[in-house]
Amino acid sequence: MGQIHGLSPTPIPKAPRGLSTHHWLNFLQAAYRLQPRPSDFDFQQLRRFLKLALKTPIWLNPIDYSLLASLIPKGYPGRVVEIINILVKNQVSPSAPAAPVPTPICPTTTPPPPPPPSPEAHVPPPYVEPTTTQCFPILHPPGAPSAHRPWQMKDLQAIKQEVSSSALGSPQFMQTLRLAVQQFDPTAKDLQDLLQYLCSSLVVSLHHQQLNTLITEAETRGMTGYNPMAGPLRMQANNPAQQGLRREYQNLWLAAFSTLPGNTRDPSWAAILQGLEEPYCAFVERLNVALDNGLPEGTPKEPILRSLAYSNANKECQKILQARGHTNSPLGEMLRTCQAWTPKDKTKVLVVQPRRPPPTQPCFRCGKVGHWSRDCTQPRPPPGPCPLCQDPSHWKRDCPQLKPPQEEGEPLLLDLPSTSGTTEEKNSLRGEI
């Protein structure tokens, strides 16, 4: 306990351009379950494959990971196949299939051999649950007792950067924290440090009150491995050897975020409008990401997304949806309806204001008819008499008193020799040469 190791986890990789953050977190959560841990090359190949898969229409609705696994080419480098296989298993696990009914086999007959696998089918290898885990700040080296490594500043900065654009308690906020807890396996003291680094003092106080309530209920209910004589749950969860109790405390720490008050400002997703030339699919994707970042966890997103997909669309898409009767249809129907819509090419015409006829009244400046006062060529008269000479006919800058007087006896030009004599001298010089 308290031993500091030099090995530190790499920062959370960035999502490829065009992929939603909540989708990327699902892939990261599956990648960190691999043993040994994925390398930078594995993440690079995963990003490369997802960039190619983004061109397919599987991102419009909840992703079918089985369909995504069929898009992986044979012999694709990295561990992309294992990551997709984990997601396929998690997607199928909620609806467990019924147990197969055993068929009676006659003792005299031999069971038919299984058909050979087709060489053309590309089936990902089965996922094998790792026997040992290597998480941080709790280190689990094989064949040695668990040890604790405190938070490093770059770990906290990486987590804060991921949740900076998400609202408190939103699905993306909670999914990022779950991924960080799964990757680092923090103790109770580490979780308290993380909370103080991410949230304000008010949120820390409210979270602490809710966490104490949940811990009291859990201690009363009873937990596997919990010994009331060994101290409170928070103290036992700080022990690196008590992995089960630490997991229970981590789940309670995450559950305490569900009752925190949200942001009282107007939600940002309510002001998202479709641009005049923006594709409808891109507009719905922006709405989807904004709802993931702004809605509290557990709030149904589908009705709000359908309502905003029609009310915040531009007028042309609203007319198309209204004509087809898809104002409150499933999101897939609305996307297919507006899929072929393209903005019309509107020719920009320069509107020139016609010239008004000349006025019939005389100009206020010169008294003539036929032009406006702003077009008059007559200089503007001074507002009053000159402050120097009291003459009302000129401005101060034109006052003759400001000009220096000239002497009458001094000639303006010097006496120059006559041009005839100069010409004769030049001709004589040319003749001598």
From Swiss-Prot:
- Keyword match DNA-binding: no
GO molecular function per UniProt: nucleic acid binding; structural molecule activity; zinc ion binding
Where is the region Disordered?
Answer: 94-121, 397-433
Q: What is the residue range of the motif PPXY motif? A: 124-127
Q: Where is the composition biased (Pro residues)?
A: 97-121
What processes in GO biological process is this protein linked to? viral translational frameshifting
* Motif PTAP/PSAP motif per record, residues: 94-97
Q: Where is the lipid attached (N-myristoyl glycine)?
A: G2
Q: Where along the chain is composition biased (Basic and acidic residues)?
A: 423-433
Q: Entry's Pfam families?
A: Gag_p19, Gag_p24, Gag_p24_C, zf-CCHC
Sorted keywords for this record are: Capsid protein, Host-virus interaction, Lipoprotein, Metal-binding, Myristate, Repeat, Ubl conjugation, Viral nucleoprotein, Virion, Zinc, Zinc-finger
> What is the protein's given name?
Gag polyprotein
State the species of origin.
Human T-cell leukemia virus 2 (HTLV-2)
Q: What is the lineage of its organism?
A: Viruses, Riboviria, Pararnavirae, Artverviricota, Revtraviricetes
Q: Gene name, please?
A: gag
